[in-house]
Amino acid sequence: MTGTTGERQTAGRPLSYIEFIALAAALMSLNALAIDIMLPGLQQIGADLGVENENHRQYVISAYFAGMAAALLPFGPASDRFGRRAPMLFGLGIYVLAGIAAAFSQSFEMMLALRFLQGVGAASTRVIAVSMVRDRFGGRQMAEMMSLIFMVFMVIPVVAPSVGQIMLVFGDWRLIFIAMGAIGLVITVWALFRMPETLRPEDRRPFTLASIGSAFAMVLTNRLSLLYTLASTATLGALFSFINSAQQVYVGIYGLGVMFPILF
């Protein structure tokens, strides 16, 4: 990054290498946090919101995935057109507000709608955090940076279910969503004041259907890109299927209760 675009938009000293890794990992971890921390509370959510069919409790996770999937496409081109910071902060705002609002859901339908919105907001961090790394680093250095970020990121799926289970000891499932929103707010403020704009004005692209279609055609006609996409789709599909049914299988079928976060 040459340094004129983003750093003038943030206060204080420039972002260090270590802080950039930590912030990028924190942004990406919000996605895993929104899924894993609330898994122990699915049973309570279903009971409190009147879900009669226990299979329908999993819709709380499915709605989140649906929102994220729907928003991944528009956030990418939007960040190429308007820069990285504005779309990312917009998405973070949706994530925080939807998470806190979900804590006050009075019906299962309201919960699903808010989880869909939270997924929409989380899509911004998933797409844009990677783009910000690509803006600042290239080649081997980018690969090393992404490896470090994912090392930090992988801590969240390990500890989040246990944190959620501990919260259920001191409160109910609503406390989990309030905590989720609070953590998102802290990371949003951190990004607002410390994360610079990484996309230079001369590198921005028009946000048109033609440009989006051209980019899609480039990916779909490249054999290597298509194979990587299919492999990633198969892997993530299996992972999301496991996450979507894990709580019901571990708790409902095997009766593991509070042991679920440890075994998960």
Residue ranges of model-derived segments:
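Extracytoplasmic gate region of multi-pass secondary transporters
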Residues: 224-264
